[in-house]
């Protein structure tokens, strides 16, 4: 496997596809390398339809949990609710015969959970057969962290606790939360330690997700990984962008390799996140960085079947066939039914609208259908709109690539004086008084 540093990599390397290629050439059409002026290699995947059968990846162990496929669904506000997670799991089971990955609930605020905010409790809904149940906490305060994690343990609310230190949204960072917080090393360590202490003596692992740093001048991921491991985290996951990048440009996978190398003696897995839009991307990331698993976010928007493809790619099995438009219409209808069961029919249909453009990307459907779906209000109305396409054998054209929000890089909004003292463990004022879900 390649580890990208400031030095050039070796002349050749085995890929997860079993090929050996010189570094100046793409591996099996899946990989290209850019060389920045700074002297840093940035590796990233190219879109490819090639169904490479991978050398099987090792199962991923996160504390007491073992995942046959080292794949995690990233928490996404307003997306990874019980309806979407159920749909992803159904697709994996239907196409691969079992559910092998970890599907994480959308982020909830620790304080809102402890105070039993109605919206927050609704967001923590899990399906009866969902196992393991994974819940992500947003927190900036060790006190609320401990209380929330203890509540999860005492009330059997989840089997896994993840912690969000990766959100780059200005309304979060301006209060010292999300991707701003790991800069405060002592406070960060206190928060992780609080969650681990609350889960002590149980089978509930605590994991931590963070970014490369605030910006290129304030990278925090190496310290964050070391501190998280020292405080008892069972795994860490790195989104290979800074907060300043938000979701723009390309993720710098070489930073995942740096973190993996930095944490080689920690004994805990390092997962990579950023720009996984196809199954081949996951294999490429693991090959290039040596990471132990992948976390997938925007790439699955409108593609809940992606997790079946990822499971196939990373366990050495043939990829399932690409779904036709007819099959996708049935998946859309199922998604709507699940949303209606969770939110009620009217609210559920409104929630579906934002998924429509993602589902239909690359398919030959007219503007009329897209407009009708953007106004859908009942399940019957939805079925009527989809019916003319239910037998369509059409396949999506060029459906891979970036999905969801991308935007532009920008200056990170921080509390006044935030960068003055990284050892300051003062809890930022008012940061935990937020609605769950971002």
Stretches found by the model and what they are:
Residues 2, 30-35, 42-67, 71, ...:
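Alpha/beta catalytic cores of nucleotide-metabolism and tRNA/nucleoside-modifying enzymes
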Residues 76-78, 108-110, 138-140, 166-168, ...:
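Active-site beta-loop-alpha junctions enriched in small/polar residues
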Residues 71-74, 103-105, 133-137, 161, ...:
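Hydrophobic faces of well-ordered beta-strands that scaffold small-molecule active sites
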Residues 51-61, 76-155:
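Glycine-rich, positively charged N-terminal anion/phosphate-binding segment
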Residues 150-161, 165-175, 186-268:
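Alpha/beta enzyme core
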Residues 93, 100, 157-158, 233, ...:
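A structural motif
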């Amino acid at each position: 496997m390649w580890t990208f540093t400031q030095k050039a990599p070796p002349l050749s390397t085995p890929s997860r596809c079993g090929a050996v290629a010189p570094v100046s050439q793409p591996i099996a059409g899946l990989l290209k390398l850019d060389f920045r002026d700074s002297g840093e290699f940035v590796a990233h995947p190219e879109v490819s339809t090639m169904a490479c059968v991978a050398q099987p990846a090792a199962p991923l162990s996160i504390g007491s949990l073992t995942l046959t496929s080292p794949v995690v669904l990233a928490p996404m506000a307003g997306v990874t609710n019980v309806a979407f997670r159920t749909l992803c799991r159904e697709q994996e089971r239907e196409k691969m015969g079992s559910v092998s990955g970890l599907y994480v609930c959308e982020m909830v605020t620790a304080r809102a959970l402890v105070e039993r905010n109605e919206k927050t409790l609704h967001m923590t809904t899990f399906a009866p057969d969902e196992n393991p149940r994974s819940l992500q906490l947003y927190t900036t305060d060790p006190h609320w962290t401990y209380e929330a994690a203890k509540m999860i343990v005492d009330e059997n609310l989840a089997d896994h606790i993840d912690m969000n230190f990766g959100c780059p949204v200005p309304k979060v960072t301006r209060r010292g939360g999300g991707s701003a917080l790991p800069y405060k090393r002592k406070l960060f360590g206190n928060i992780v330690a609080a969650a681990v202490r609350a889960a002590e003596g149980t089978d509930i692992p605590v994991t931590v997700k963070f970014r490369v740093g605030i910006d290129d001048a304030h990278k925090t991921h190496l310290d964050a990984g070391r501190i998280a491991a020292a405080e008892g985290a069972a795994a860490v996951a790195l989104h290979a962008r800074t907060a300043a990048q938000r979701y723009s440009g390309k993720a710098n996978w070489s930073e995942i390799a740096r973190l993996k190398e930095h944490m080689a003696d920690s004994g805990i897995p390092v997962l990579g996140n950023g720009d996984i839009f196809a199954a081949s991307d996951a294999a490429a990331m693991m090959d290039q960085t040596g990471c132990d698993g992948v976390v997938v976010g925007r790439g699955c928007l409108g593609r809940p079947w992606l997790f079946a493809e990822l499971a196939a790619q990373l366990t050495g099995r043939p990829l399932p066939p690409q779904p036709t438009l007819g099959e996708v219409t049935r998946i859309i209808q199922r998604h709507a039914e699940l949303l209606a069961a969770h939110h009620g029919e009217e609210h559920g249909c409104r929630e579906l609208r934002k998924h429509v453009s993602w589902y239909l990307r690359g398919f030959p459907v007219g503007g009329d259908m897209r407009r009708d779906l953007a106004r859908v209000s009942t399940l019957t109305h939805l079925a009527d709109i989809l019916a003319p396409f239910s037998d369509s054998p059409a396949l999506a054209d060029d459906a891979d690539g970036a999905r969801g929000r991308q935007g532009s890089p920008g200056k990170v909004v921080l509390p006044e004086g935030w960068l003055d003292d990284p050892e300051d463990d003062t809890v930022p004022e008012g940061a935990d008084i937020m609605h769950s879900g971002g």
